[in-house]
């Protein structure tokens, strides 16, 4: 049964749980400056989950009574209901999510609520909350990457034979297929998912039990708490458990790589959608117009994703800078770890959700792609390879074809436009089968090794990714 207010000590009416040590209250400006509840309240459910596991362990170890545990569980359920209903009162004076919840718990269940913090500190408490939250975010992001890869592979399968120019230095290089090009991004995002999964292994270690920095003298069972919360194990050093945020930095580094890959894809979508290129169109729901130019259809989503990549990269640098000068163990600097971390996860989640939808609706303009591939002597390497297969050293073949390209530029024609006699003037080993080699279809079909751009290989790879991400 909850104590009446008159039976409770002054904690219930104090602004801070630690204020008994001080002779004067902090100023209102300092309260605003040091408070984190406006942003860390998003950890509330994870904070409650961690507290319930901690209370269960305390009761199992005989540190608190079974009645205390029952009261704490009842109070926490009430707090969860209030949070879900939007009626929980978050107070700036109480600094953070932890003290707000603890204060309300004491109001609801009295002394049992004041016993909850036995054997722990906000230092190991917040480290646990962040890891619980981040673990869930990683699982969600891995699934969003799966969805994006599935969408890309589906479009790739439909365009396994759609020929486009491949570029190096933004100059026409060799023919590839649009399906092959999209599968390059499917590979990148696959590695991104692997990085997140690997990061999760290091996130999934329990800090709780480290207390402020040196552990606790109570006979706690950290392994029980770890098992209850689904952690793979416990952090093995109490100083390290509360002081480092390398797991958050590692996540932000993985997020920066994902956004970098998104940014590269975005750049190509913007270029491909330009009327000067005209390779694709995006669905209207991903574009906006102009307030002055009625004809405009702007690829705002990929453009903004490019910009948000800088934002995510900035959060990574901020976290690295935050950690670099801190001595062991916990310092108030670490309060600054959350907003950038939260924003990174939010930005990445929204970006991947949008891109999975947008990628699946790309409208391909195959004729424009093919026309572009016919420019720039995209099959010049095929002619060089043809000569090598007839005994010419590659460097000699390279020189022969370079002369042919230069002559064609002067004449305003392509290598495929030359007659057999004209081609044989460059080297007598050239035969009538050369004209099949110099076609776009012949060029891509010849590259049938694993990882090549032959349509049959592209179909196999697309089907593999589709099955992998189903």
Swiss-Prot record:
<dbReference type="Pfam" id="PF00206">
    <property type="entry name" value="Lyase_1"/>
</dbReference>
<dbReference type="GO" id="GO:0005829">
    <property type="term" value="C:cytosol"/>
</dbReference>
<dbReference type="InterPro" id="IPR024083">
    <property type="entry name" value="Fumarase/histidase_N"/>
</dbReference>
<comment type="pathway">
    <text>Amino-acid biosynthesis; L-arginine biosynthesis; L-arginine from L-ornithine and carbamoyl phosphate: step 3/3.</text>
</comment>
<dbReference type="InterPro" id="IPR000362">
    <property type="entry name" value="Fumarate_lyase_fam"/>
</dbReference>
<keyword id="KW-0055">Arginine biosynthesis</keyword>
<keyword id="KW-0456">Lyase</keyword>
<protein>
    <recommendedName>
        <fullName>Argininosuccinate lyase</fullName>
        <ecNumber>4.3.2.1</ecNumber>
    </recommendedName>
</protein>
<dbReference type="InterPro" id="IPR029419">
    <property type="entry name" value="Arg_succ_lyase_C"/>
</dbReference>
<keyword id="KW-0028">Amino-acid biosynthesis</keyword>
<dbReference type="InterPro" id="IPR020557">
    <property type="entry name" value="Fumarate_lyase_CS"/>
</dbReference>
<comment type="similarity">
    <text>Belongs to the lyase 1 family. Argininosuccinate lyase subfamily.</text>
</comment>
<dbReference type="InterPro" id="IPR008948">
    <property type="entry name" value="L-Aspartase-like"/>
</dbReference>
<dbReference type="InterPro" id="IPR022761">
    <property type="entry name" value="Fumarate_lyase_N"/>
</dbReference>
<dbReference type="GO" id="GO:0004056">
    <property type="term" value="F:argininosuccinate lyase activity"/>
</dbReference>
<dbReference type="GO" id="GO:0006526">
    <property type="term" value="P:L-arginine biosynthetic process"/>
</dbReference>
<dbReference type="InterPro" id="IPR009049">
    <property type="entry name" value="Argininosuccinate_lyase"/>
</dbReference>
<dbReference type="GO" id="GO:0042450">
    <property type="term" value="P:arginine biosynthetic process via ornithine"/>
</dbReference>
<dbReference type="Pfam" id="PF14698">
    <property type="entry name" value="ASL_C2"/>
</dbReference>
<keyword id="KW-0963">Cytoplasm</keyword>
């Amino acid at each position: 049964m909850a104590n009446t207010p008159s039976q409770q000590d002054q904690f219930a009416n104090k602004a801070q749980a630690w204020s008994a040590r001080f002779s004067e209250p902090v100023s209102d400006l300092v309260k605003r400056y040091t408070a984190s509840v406006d942003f860390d309240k998003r950890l509330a459910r994870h904070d409650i989950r961690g507290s319930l596991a901690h209370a269960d362990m305390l009761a199992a170890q005989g540190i608190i009574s079974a009645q205390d545990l029952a009261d704490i569980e009842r109070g926490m359920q009430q707090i969860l209901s209030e949070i879900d209903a939007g009626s929980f009162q978050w107070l700036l004076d109480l600094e953070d999510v932890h003290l707000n919840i603890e204060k309300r718990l004491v109001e609801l269940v009295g002394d049992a609520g004041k016993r909850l913090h036995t054997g722990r500190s906000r230092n190991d408490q917040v480290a646990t909350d962040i890891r619980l939250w981040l673990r869930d975010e990683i699982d969600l992001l891995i699934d969003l990457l799966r969805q994006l890869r599935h969408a890309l592979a589906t479009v790739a399968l439909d365009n396994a034979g759609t020929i486009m120019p491949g570029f190096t230095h933004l100059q026409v290089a060799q023919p590839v297929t649009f399906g092959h090009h999209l599968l390059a991004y499917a590979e990148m995002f696959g590695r991104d998912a692997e990085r997140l999964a690997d990061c999760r292994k290091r996130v999934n270690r329990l800090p709780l039990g480290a207390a402020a920095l040196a552990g606790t003298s109570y006979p706690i069972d950290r392994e029980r708490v770890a098992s209850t919360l689904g952690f793979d194990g416990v952090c093995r050093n109490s100083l390290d458990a509360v002081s480092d945020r390398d797991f958050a930095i590692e996540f932000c580094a993985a997020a920066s790589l994902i956004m970098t890959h998104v940014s590269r894809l975005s750049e190509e979508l913007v270029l491909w959608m330009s009327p000067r290129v005209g390779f694709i169109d995006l669905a209207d729901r991903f574009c906006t117009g102009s307030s002055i130019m009625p004809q405009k259809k702007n690829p705002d989503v990929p453009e903004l994703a490019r910009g948000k990549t800088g934002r995510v990269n900035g959060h990574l640098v901020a976290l690295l800078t935050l950690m670099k000068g801190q001595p062991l163990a916990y310092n108030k600097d670490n309060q600054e770890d959350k907003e950038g971390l939260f924003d990174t996860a939010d930005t990445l989640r929204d970006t991947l959700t949008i891109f999975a939808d947008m990628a699946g609706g790309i409208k391909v303009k195959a004729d424009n792609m093919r026309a572009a591939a016919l420019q720039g002597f995209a099959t010049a390497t095929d002619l060089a390879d043809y000569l090598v297969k007839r005994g010419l050293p590659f460097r000699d073949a390279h020189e022969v074809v370079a002369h042919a390209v230069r002559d064609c530029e002067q004449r305003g024609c392509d290598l495929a436009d030359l007659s057999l006699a004209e081609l044989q003037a460059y080297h007598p080993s050239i035969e009538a089968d050369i004209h099949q080699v110099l076609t776009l279809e012949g060029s891509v079909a010849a590259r049938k090794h694993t990882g090549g751009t032959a349509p049959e290989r592209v179909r196999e790879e697309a089907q593999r990714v589709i099955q992998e991400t189903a």
